[in-house]
């Protein structure tokens, strides 16, 4: 829905006048009539700025009414003076200033002189300002005066010299002040912006008042104006050269420099030459004027930095006049020089802001070039046409930057490309674009790019704008479908949709402007709409979602009329194609189209209904669809609309309530979010439309003409709104029942929260609904009970809702219940279960808002502070929180005191972290900016800090232990205290920094440490068993100790971080105002430093890191310089400590440097990102020098620390693009570090390298390791990291030289792996041009030599790495050269490693060639033919003469690739008859034919067998093709009969061969079953008579994978073909075969095998029953039992899915048959399984089980005929229908007598209420993280209520055969006994059981409701029975 945003109310600050001005106005104002003075006086007395604006607008009419003689009126003079003073006093951004200027622009001519005098007077006063920090106001005023304000401009003209003088002074003063504040970032930033404004004002002065500075007069070099201009020029050149200034200041200085030079330089036509000389560094000082050299000496003489050159280029492009070649040949030369300079800078400037500037300036250059092109500039046309060098280099820039990580660079690349096309188009204006070779070549190259290249989309769009869509489509008609197929990737979807929009819009324009004006729409639909509809129906979830979000709205906007075509097509197939859980189907596509159309205003729902576009039933079907997104689209159709005040119809409200019933329990967070968001839109619409309805009601008498409009009865609609919202809230509160799932609670609370927020009472508005009126004490209790949820987001939502309703909530709570809640919170805050303290925190935060908290609850715990009670006006929350924190603090201080004596007792009885967590939570509720009890808070803060240190000291020995978490050794004998001694000994730190140098002598080391411990840590009162609060014995476990200590540390860290946030209040003038002192902050910093630098565990330093980040962020925002400098001091200290390599260093030296990288990360993250990032630069420089190997032999520790810290920094997303300039250096350090002899350095280098690969190529976005999504072109890579080109080339050469083929010695260079890994991430691009200085060719020979490595993996990687360095058209030549390098069979020296490496390289190159888009190209075919011929000459390598099986396998893999490709293009394949003959020869001579001669395992044997098998299968597939089999040509007959059959493969003794053969058979079988026989006709002949072979394999096959495949093939076969053969193949009859299938499930341990066996056995059962063949009762019973077993909640998903599939297949036959086929008990047991599957936690299982009900509904519809049936549904609806269908079946079978008691048993539950409620054994209590039920989706009460609903309906049915009275009495007695027991158990629970015994309370509450429901049905049945008995008696 498009909700129009309410315009923000403009805040206008009112102006006021001083006493003197007011007196002056009062003297002139007249009471009897309004004059100018009285108007101004009235205006000044207004306090509202908006009203003042209205008042000022009345000034001009009043002034214009005055005659010319009034110019001498002192009143007018006084008023103009006041107006001038007011104008200059107003802030620049105040709208009043603009309104005043606008009004004064209308001043009559005769008053101008007087007004100018007044303004000049005011401006002169302004220019006298001497305070640097007040300059900004003057500068703003000068800028305002020149901005469309006649008076202001006239005033500046009058004071031109004074203004110039002020500007010179301002520039110098601000620069000086900036230098004196070096290091004070806040002040410097402000001064920089002031300096920027001063430069801008100077430029405005020169641009807007040119007449004052041009002409002969001022160019006298002695004149003041000339001197002033010289000074301004000097300042601008100084600022331009000053690298310490902000980049924006330097950029603007570049503009100013060119502008000032242009104004001063003569002759003007020589100016371009001067700029060219500066840019090219020719420094022709003699030809430059002396004044220029004197003022800009540095620019003329020094070597200009890259940034200065860039800003000079920008200045020249922006400030010189390029239009129509006005600067002549010099201008053309300058234009080309600028391009040359910019392109040379592109390889140097890699820092993100500079790269962005460069791309923007290049785009400006292309605009200037376009402007400079005129018909009579042939030289420029030659230099700028598409084939020129300049354009070529610019295109290369575009190709290497169109996937740049910065959005701005990508956007500018697109603009550059578009402008380059326009330049070429302008140059070739006379000729046709279609035939132009430049455009043709560019189009071909772009289309041959892969679709994952984002730059392709924008560039193609530009090309479409130039050439037209039709010209592009003529090259490839499938482009629209290709682009739509790309849209399943969200990162590409926006680009794809933009390209599609450009194409279809352009196509439409082409059609409508052409000759086919009447018929174009059908063609347009075929191209753009039909593929869309097909994908919407059948596409995957992501693809359809992104198409609907990005593409569909654009398509409808372009052609709204296409909607009716889309609806017509989809409606026609909606009934037949309803979709499934994986596809939307036509129904889902229809919902999506209608939703989008309605949301964008193309349709209204009333029209949709009335025109029959979709029925209510169809929407209902959509609302409960299996596909989540169809449900959301159906809901969106109801909720979203273009008009925010459109009235919600009754149908919409009914459908929403229907939706809520079945969709609250969605496991998908995104679906829940969308539901809440859409309903929020609906509520907003109800609110907005209700306001309209209230207005209609007020104006009802005027609306009598509207007979049929809703205006007739507004109150009726409002009442319906109220009823709807009330019903909705009832359902939502009902959904918060005991045991409701987390998704249900989340959805219900979110929607209730939206209702409370949207329908909150606002002043002056009647509200249609108020949630607080729906609240009662039971609902309040329900909301408070949500705090007991183990999911924190539920607690958050409940808390927020209670806060919105707190007025009514607290009124409904009595003091006793509040007291119990407080007591529960205090108990939970010290619970040993970690999630209990979170509940306690929410309870305390909730109670803190209660006014009487202190009287009701806190009075028992702490003494009242009389001062606080006296002042009742003080905020309730602050008083309560202060009291709560005091209470918690007192408790925790006492507990810490006890913990010092015995940490173990604390862990078992009162873990302290819960109290601290509650303190933290309470602090979050505080209004920190507005505290009343500052003195008390100061004391509390000081105590909290001390408490934190003490608690940390108690627990840190455990946290900083060297033992991994949880691996504290445990003694089995819990009766002795030795274990506790062991715990405390083990948790002492035992690591030293000898980690790098020597292995630890662990036993001795531990022994010494233990002795020290024994000496220094005598323990008192240690025992294993301790009595807790409830006097029960509590056994201390290691987990308890660990949880207590780790969580305490975490809470302390967060608390200290929170307390640091109190620091900014310290910046006030009075130090006493702050709650925390500077000294305390420094101590906190030292505390964090200690833990970050010395902790060994990631967990420990991560906990400290969270708090430390808060501290550093706070310090960075401080006004106090000493505090602000602290992070920098800490950073320098730690870097020095790392460098020092002192053996006594306390730095933690672990494998990854533990917390040190975190420490440095936190310090750098606090540095402002928009500055120069000096700290980051300094740190990286230091670390790089440490990380790089040096010739001196220092300790390895600093190098390891440096590498680890660099890794952390490169992984830190907060540093963003600021870290990218250092990536190349990082790669070099990592690769060089990998050559270190020290393992620790190599390890850290590897980790750093991995982080850098991710930083460069992005996070892996798929399972495919070599996916092109995580790669980039070689050109782009070396363009972004140019320094890596020479480095990688040199390293590769060194590596290749170590692999000297002449040397027999085995040499492996350590860098080989990393080099090949990074080179393998690159890929070739058709766009790689000839203008790049970095050629890829030099890499190729070295990579080829790397293929000779003795390491298998390296050879494999070299094959992959070679691909990007060989252009596609070069592949055949390279492959031929590699193949020719292979030895002949007669060669003397055969090196198998070299052969293998070469074959792998051939394989990868060939694969890239066959995958390329060159297919069908004549060059491609010739290249392929040459390769096939050459391969034929080396075939000996695939045969027996080659003794190495590994290289034989590699050669065979190449043959398989060729065979598959040639087979797929059979027309081409038939040209290579010799190839196929050779393949047959290779197969006939292979070991599969002649037998395997190897007795023992031989290296590569399996690999060889797999490769030869793949070749056989490939050849079989090709030769089985129908055209070959039926052909009579001798060629075809030669190759039609391969030497090996599939049966031969299936009989192989090697399971690897059998497995591949079975996979091929399965694939062929599925193709046959999928009716692809037309294409795969020949496959049928391969499957003939396989049944017997497969059946015999079932008994013989020992390999599990093969056995599974055999079963799967049999399952997919037609049993009519299989069963006749079982007798002769395996000597079994069908019954025995079924028994054998069932036995597999008992005997196999494989889930896959058992699942397939169940499916196969079930298929057999169905087949036998349908064909009326006898199955023994025992076998059937066994089958049913297996089915039931498969449905257990604990079973694996695959088994559950198998069971669901079986139930679907037997639904018609057994579950809903007219007569019972199996016994009632078995049938009911199977129905119970279906119901269990519908409640499974796994969505896939639920969806599969829902298909059972879909089959049942479809069957019902076909038998019952008319009437609406749900034919595709989600699990909640299916569950409802399952119970309904079962009850109907019981009636149909006449089994209600026997069936109802069984269903009542289900309802009652067969478990004892006491189950799980008995006092647990101590060891059971040890589980600290028990979260209750395992299934987080199933809701027992939901299924109970649904079953109860259907049983009640069944009980009320007429002619019902009731169960026996005795049976009902037995059930009744049992239910009553259980009810009494449940009541007793509930009363036995402690107070507030919902919090203190949540699981037990929930279980009993559920059972209570189940029993009540059961008793209700029993009573009804008994009353019905008695009624029937009475009737019988009568």
UniProtKB/Swiss-Prot annotation:
InterPro entries: ARM-type_fold, THADA-like_TPR, THADA-like_TPR_C, THADA/TRM732_DUF2428, tRNA_methyltransferase_THADA. Keywords: tRNA processing. GO terms for biological process: tRNA methylation; tRNA nucleoside ribose methylation. Signal peptide: none annotated. Belongs to the THADA family. PANTHER family: THADA/DEATH RECEPTOR INTERACTING PROTEIN, THYROID ADENOMA-ASSOCIATED PROTEIN. Together with methyltransferase FTSJ1, methylates the 2'-O-ribose of nucleotides at position 32 of the anticodon loop of substrate tRNAs. This is tRNA (32-2'-O)-methyltransferase regulator THADA.
């Amino acid at each position: 829905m498009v909700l129009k945003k309410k315009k923000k109310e403009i805040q206008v600050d009112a102006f006021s006048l001083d006493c003197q001005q007011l007196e002056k106005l009062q003297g002139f104002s007249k009471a009897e009539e309004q004059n100018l003075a009285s108007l101004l006086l009235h205006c000044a007395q207004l306090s509202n700025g908006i009203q003042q604006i209205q008042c000022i607008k009345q000034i001009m009419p009043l002034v214009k009414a005055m005659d010319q003689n009034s110019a001498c009126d002192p009143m007018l003079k006084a008023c103009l003076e006041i107006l001038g003073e007011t104008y200059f006093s107003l802030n620049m951004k105040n709208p009043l200033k603009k309104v005043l200027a606008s009004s004064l622009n209308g001043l009559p001519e005769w008053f101008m002189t007087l007004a100018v005098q007044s303004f000049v007077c005011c401006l002169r006063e302004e220019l006298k300002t001497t305070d640097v920090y007040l300059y900004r106001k003057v500068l703003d005023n000068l800028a305002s005066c020149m901005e469309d304000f006649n008076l202001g401009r006239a005033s500046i003209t009058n004071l031109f010299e004074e203004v110039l003088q002020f500007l010179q002074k301002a520039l110098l003063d601000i620069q000086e002040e900036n230098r004196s504040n070096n290091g004070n970032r806040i002040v410097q930033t402000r001064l920089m912006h002031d300096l920027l404004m001063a430069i801008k004002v100077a430029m405005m002065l020169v641009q807007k008042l040119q007449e004052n500075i041009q002409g002969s007069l001022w160019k006298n070099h002695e004149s003041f104006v000339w001197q002033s201009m010289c000074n301004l020029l000097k300042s601008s050149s100084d600022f331009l050269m000053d690298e310490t200034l902000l980049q924006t200041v330097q950029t603007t200085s570049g503009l100013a420099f060119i502008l000032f030079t242009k104004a001063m330089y003569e002759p003007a036509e020589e100016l371009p030459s001067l700029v060219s000389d500066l840019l090219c560094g020719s420094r022709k000082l003699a030809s430059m004027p002396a004044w220029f050299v004197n003022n800009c000496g540095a620019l003329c003489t020094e070597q200009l930095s890259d940034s200065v050159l860039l800003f000079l280029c920008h200045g020249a492009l922006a400030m010189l006049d390029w239009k129509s070649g006005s600067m002549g040949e010099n201008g053309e030369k300058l234009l080309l020089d600028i391009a040359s300079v910019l392109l040379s800078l592109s390889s140097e400037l890699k820092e993100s802001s500079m790269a962005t500037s460069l791309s923007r300036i290049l785009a400006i250059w292309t605009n200037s070039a376009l402007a400079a092109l005129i018909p009579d500039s042939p030289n420029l046309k030659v230099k700028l046409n598409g084939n020129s060098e300049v354009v070529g280099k610019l295109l290369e820039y575009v190709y290497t930057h169109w996937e740049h990580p910065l959005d701005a660079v990508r956007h500018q690349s697109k603009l550059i490309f578009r402008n380059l096309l326009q330049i070429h188009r302008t140059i070739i204006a006379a000729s046709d674009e279609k035939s132009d070779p430049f455009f043709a070549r560019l189009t071909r190259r772009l289309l041959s790019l892969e679709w994952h290249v984002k730059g392709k989309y924008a560039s193609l769009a530009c090309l479409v704008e130039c050439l037209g869509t039709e010209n592009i489509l003529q090259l490839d008609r499938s482009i629209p479908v290709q682009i739509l197929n790309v849209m399943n990737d969200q990162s590409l979807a926006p680009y794809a949709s933009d390209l599609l929009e450009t194409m279809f819009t352009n196509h439409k324009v082409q059609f409508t402007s052409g000759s086919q004006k009447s018929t174009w729409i059908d063609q347009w639909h075929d191209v753009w709409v039909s593929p869309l509809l097909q994908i919407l129906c059948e596409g995957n979830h992501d693809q359809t979602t992104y198409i609907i979000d990005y593409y569909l709205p654009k398509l409808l906007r372009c052609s709204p009329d296409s909607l009716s075509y889309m609806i017509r097509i989809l409606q026609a197939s909606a009934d037949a194609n309803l979709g499934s859980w994986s596809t939307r189907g036509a129904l889902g596509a229809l919902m999506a189209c209608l939703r989008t159309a309605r949301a964008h205003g193309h349709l209204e729902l009333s029209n949709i209904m009335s025109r029959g576009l979709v029925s209510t039933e169809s929407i209902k079907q959509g609302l409960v669809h299996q596909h989540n997104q169809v449900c959301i689209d159906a809901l969106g159709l109801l909720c979203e609309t273009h008009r925010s005040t459109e009235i919600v119809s009754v149908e919409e409200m009914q459908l929403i309530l229907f939706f809520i019933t079945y969709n609250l329990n969605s496991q998908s967070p995104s679906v829940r979010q969308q539901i809440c968001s859409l309903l929020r839109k609906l509520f907003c619409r109800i609110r907005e439309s209700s306001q309209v309805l209230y207005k209609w009601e007020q104006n009802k008498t005027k609306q009598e003409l509207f007979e049929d409009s809703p205006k007739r009865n507004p109150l009726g609609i409002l009442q319906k709104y109220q009823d709807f919202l009330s019903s909705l809230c009832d359902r939502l509160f009902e959904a918060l029942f005991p045991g409701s799932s987390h998704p249900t609670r989340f959805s219900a609370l979110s929607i209730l929260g939206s209702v409370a927020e949207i329908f909150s009472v606002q002043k002056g508005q009647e509200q249609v609904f108020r949630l607080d009126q729906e609240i009662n004490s039971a609902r309040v209790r329900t909301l408070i009970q949500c705090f007991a949820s183990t999911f924190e987001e539920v607690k958050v939502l409940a808390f927020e809702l209670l806060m919105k309703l707190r007025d009514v909530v607290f009124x409904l709570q009595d003091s006793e219940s509040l007291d119990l809640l407080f007591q529960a919170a205090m108990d939970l805050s010290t619970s040993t279960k970690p999630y209990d303290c979170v509940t306690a925190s929410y309870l305390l935060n909730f109670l803190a808002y209660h006014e009487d908290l202190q009287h009701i609850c806190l009075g028992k715990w702490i003494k009242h502070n009389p001062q606080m009670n006296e002042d009742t006006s003080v905020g309730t929350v602050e008083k309560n929180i202060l009291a709560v924190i005091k209470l918690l603090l007192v408790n925790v201080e006492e507990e810490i005191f006890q913990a010092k004596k015995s940490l173990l007792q604390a862990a078992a009885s009162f873990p302290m972290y819960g109290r601290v967590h509650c303190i933290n939570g309470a602090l979050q509720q505080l209004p920190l900016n507005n505290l009343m009890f500052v003195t008390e808070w100061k004391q509390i803060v000081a105590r909290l800090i001390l408490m934190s240190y003490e608690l940390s000291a108690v627990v840190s020995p455990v946290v900083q232990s060297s033992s991994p978490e949880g691996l504290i050794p445990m003694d089995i004998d819990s009766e002795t205290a030795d274990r506790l001694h062991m715990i405390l000994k083990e948790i002492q730190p035992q690591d030293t920094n000898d980690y790098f140098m020597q292995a630890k002598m662990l036993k001795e080391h531990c022994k010494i440490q233990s002795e020290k411990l024994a000496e220094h840590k005598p323990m008192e009162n240690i025992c294993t068993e301790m009595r807790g609060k409830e006097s029960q014995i509590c056994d201390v476990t290691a987990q308890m100790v660990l949880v207590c200590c780790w969580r305490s540390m975490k809470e302390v860290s967060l608390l200290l971080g929170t307390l640091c946030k109190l620091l900014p209040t310290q910046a006030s003038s009075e130090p006493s105002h702050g709650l925390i002192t500077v000294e305390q902050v420094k101590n906190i910093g030292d505390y964090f430093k200690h833990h970050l630098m010395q902790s060994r565990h990631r967990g420990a330093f991560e906990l400290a890191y969270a708090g430390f980040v808060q501290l550093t962020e706070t310090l960075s925002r401080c006004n106090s310089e000493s505090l602000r400098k602290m992070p920098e001091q800490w950073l320098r200290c730690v870097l020095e400590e790392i460098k020092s390599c002192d053996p006594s260093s306390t730095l933690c030296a672990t494998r990854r440097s533990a917390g040190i990288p975190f420490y440095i990360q936190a310090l750098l993250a606090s540095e402002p990102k928009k500055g120069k990032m000096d700290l980051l630069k300094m740190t990286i420089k230091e670390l790089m020098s440490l990380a790089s190997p040096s010739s001196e032999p220092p300790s390895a520790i600093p190098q390891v620390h440096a590498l680890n810290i660099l890794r952390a920094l490169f992984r830190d997303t907060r540093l963003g693009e600021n870290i990218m300039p250092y990536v190349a250096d990082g790669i070099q350090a990592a690769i060089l570090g990998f050559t270190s002899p020290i393992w620790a350095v190599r390890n850290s280098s590897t980790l750093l390298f991995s982080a850098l690969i991710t930083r460069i190529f992005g996070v892996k976005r798929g399972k495919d390791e070599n996916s092109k999504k995580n790669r980039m072109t070689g050109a782009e890579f070396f363009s972004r990291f140019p320094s890596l080109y020479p480095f990688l080339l040199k390293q590769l050469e060194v590596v290749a030289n170590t692999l000297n083929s002449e040397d027999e010695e085995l040499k492996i260079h350590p860098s080989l792996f990393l080099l090949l890994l990074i080179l393998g991430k690159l890929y070739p691009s058709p766009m790689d041009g000839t203008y790049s200085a970095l050629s890829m060719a030099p890499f190729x020979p070295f990579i080829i030599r790397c293929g000779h490595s003795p390491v298998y993996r390296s050879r494999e990687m070299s094959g992959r790495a070679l691909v990007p360095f060989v252009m596609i058209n070069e592949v055949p030549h390279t492959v031929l050269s590699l193949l020719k390098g292979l030895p002949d069979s007669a060669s003397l020296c055969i090196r198998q490693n070299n052969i293998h490496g070469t074959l792998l390289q051939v394989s990868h190159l060939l694969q890239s060639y066959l995958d390329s888009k060159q297919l069908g190209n004549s060059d491609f075919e010739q290249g392929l033919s040459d390769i096939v011929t050459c391969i034929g000459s080396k075939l000996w390598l695939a045969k027996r003469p080659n003794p190495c099986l590994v290289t034989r396998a590699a050669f065979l893999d190449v043959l398989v690739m060729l065979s598959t490709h040639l087979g797929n293009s059979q027309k081409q394949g038939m040209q290579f008859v010799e190839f196929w003959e050779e393949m047959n020869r290779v197969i006939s001579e292979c070991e599969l034919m002649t037998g395997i001669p190897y007795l023992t395992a031989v290296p590569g044997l399996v690999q060889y067998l797999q490769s030869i098998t793949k070749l056989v299968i490939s050849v079989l597939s090709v030769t089985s093709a129908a055209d070959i089999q039926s052909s009579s040509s001798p060629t075809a007959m030669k190759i039609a009969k391969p030497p090996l059959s599939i049966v031969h493969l299936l009989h192989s003794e090697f399971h690897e061969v059998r497995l591949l053969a079975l996979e091929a058979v399965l694939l062929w079988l599925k193709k046959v079953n999928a009716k692809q026989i037309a294409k795969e006709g020949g496959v049928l002949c391969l499957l003939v008579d396989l049944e017997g072979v497969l059946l015999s394999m079932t008994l013989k096959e020992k390999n599990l994978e093969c056995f599974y495949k055999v079963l799967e093939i049999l399952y997919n076969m037609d049993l009519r073909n299989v069963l006749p053969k079982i007798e002769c193949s395996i000597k079994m009859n069908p019954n025995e075969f079924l028994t054998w299938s069932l036995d597999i499930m008992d005997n196999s341990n494989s889930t896959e095998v058992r699942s397939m066996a169940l499916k196969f056995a079930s298929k057999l059962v169905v087949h036998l029953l349908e064909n009326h063949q006898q199955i023994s009762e025992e076998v059937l019973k066994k089958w049913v039992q297996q089915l039931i077993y498969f449905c257990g909640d604990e079973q694996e998903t695959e088994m559950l899915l198998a069971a669901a599939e079986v139930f679907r297949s037997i639904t018609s036959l057994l579950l809903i048959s007219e007569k019972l086929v199996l016994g009632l008990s078995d049938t009911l047991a199977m129905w119970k399984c279906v119901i269990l599957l519908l409640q499974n936690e796994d969505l896939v299982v639920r969806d599969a089980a829902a298909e059972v009900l879909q089959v049942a509904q479809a069957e019902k519809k076909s038998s019952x005929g008319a009437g609406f049936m749900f034919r595709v549904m989600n699990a909640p609806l299916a569950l409802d229908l399952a119970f309904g269908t079962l009850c109907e079946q019981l009636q149909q079978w006449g089994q209600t007598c026997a069936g109802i008691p069984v269903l009542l048993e289900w309802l009652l539950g067969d478990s004892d209420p006491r189950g799980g409620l008995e006092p647990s054994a101590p060891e059971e209590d040890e589980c600290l993280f028990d979260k209750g039920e395992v299934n987080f989706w199933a809701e027992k009460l939901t299924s109970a209520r649904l079953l109860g609903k259907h049983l009640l309906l069944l009980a009320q049915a007429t002619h019902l055969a009731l169960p026996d009275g005795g049976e009902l009495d037995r059930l009744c007695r049992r239910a009553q006994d259980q009810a009494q027991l449940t009541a007793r158990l509930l009363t036995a629970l402690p107070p507030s059981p919902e919090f203190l015994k949540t699981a037990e309370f929930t279980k009993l509450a559920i059972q209570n409701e189940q029993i009540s429901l059961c008793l209700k049905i029993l009573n009804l049945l008994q009353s019905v029975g008695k009624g029937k008995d009475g009737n019988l008696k009568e």
